[in-house]
Amino acid sequence: MLLMAVDIGNTNVVIGFIDDGRIAGTYRITTKANHTSDEYGLMITQFLALSGYKPADVDDVIISSVVPKVMHSFRASIVKFLDIDPMIVGPGIKTGLNIRMDNPQNMGADCIADCAGAYYEYGGPILVADFGTATTFNYVTADASVISGLITTGIRTAAAALWEGTAQLPEVEITRPKSILAKSTKPAMQAGLYYNFLGGIERTIAQFHKEIDEDFRVVATGGLSRVFADGTNMIDIYDPDLIFKGMWHIYDRNVR
């Protein structure tokens, strides 16, 4: 059974092909609101070919989106090119999670899929950290209850404000520096961004430990998760495909 999973985020659209639970290929493109459904359809066809599949091989599609305009174009492309009406992660979809928030309907589809992936792959209690355009932390208990969500600025968003808001600071790659003892502008920016953000991550995790009276693991996912997971012993699991695993489990719960 071949499931195409689509994660539409503010910065990137990531497409994953899941073959009987195995992630067979993932592809990342820039999120652009002005892409037409035909453009998305051509991309889907190309990505399928790169993974060794044809459009007719796709049995179903599931979409997680936080960008409604792009989601509508993508959905239209899937209907046209694959002749499939995709499942959308949102209200009415069974996840197996109990979202114990003040406004559960406002929880992002990406966060829901992340939490499902973390819980069904690794069990609870678990803290899910997603390093995307925004950085989110969501806590899932042993009985699959999502009891807390934290949202803050993503590292790329913060970094862009640094070089876009100053006249002479250049754009730099977000990477783990060799040393905090920087001796020129670019290394100084890289070290400053990295250690400032890493410190915020560790302080946030520490506060969860302080306020929650149980042991839990921390799983990191998202575009820059590897950079920070390698720099701290407070992150237990690195899983770049967590959202796709979550969408696979959500899909399975709704069709079986």
From Swiss-Prot:
Q: Does the keyword Oxidoreductase apply?
A: no
Task: Tell me which cofactor or cofactors this protein depends on.
Answer: NH4(+); K(+)
Listed GO MF terms? ATP binding; metal ion binding; pantothenate kinase activity
Please report the name of this protein according to its UniProt entry.
Answer: Type III pantothenate kinase
E.C. number, please? 2.7.1.33
Keywords recorded for this protein, A-Z = ATP-binding, Coenzyme A biosynthesis, Cytoplasm, Kinase, Metal-binding, Nucleotide-binding, Potassium, Transferase
Q: Where in or outside the cell is it found? A: Cytoplasm
Q: Which residues bind ATP?
A: 7-14, 133
Organism equals Bifidobacterium adolescentis (strain ATCC 15703 / DSM 20083 / NCTC 11814 / E194a)
What does the record list as GO biological process?
coenzyme A biosynthetic process
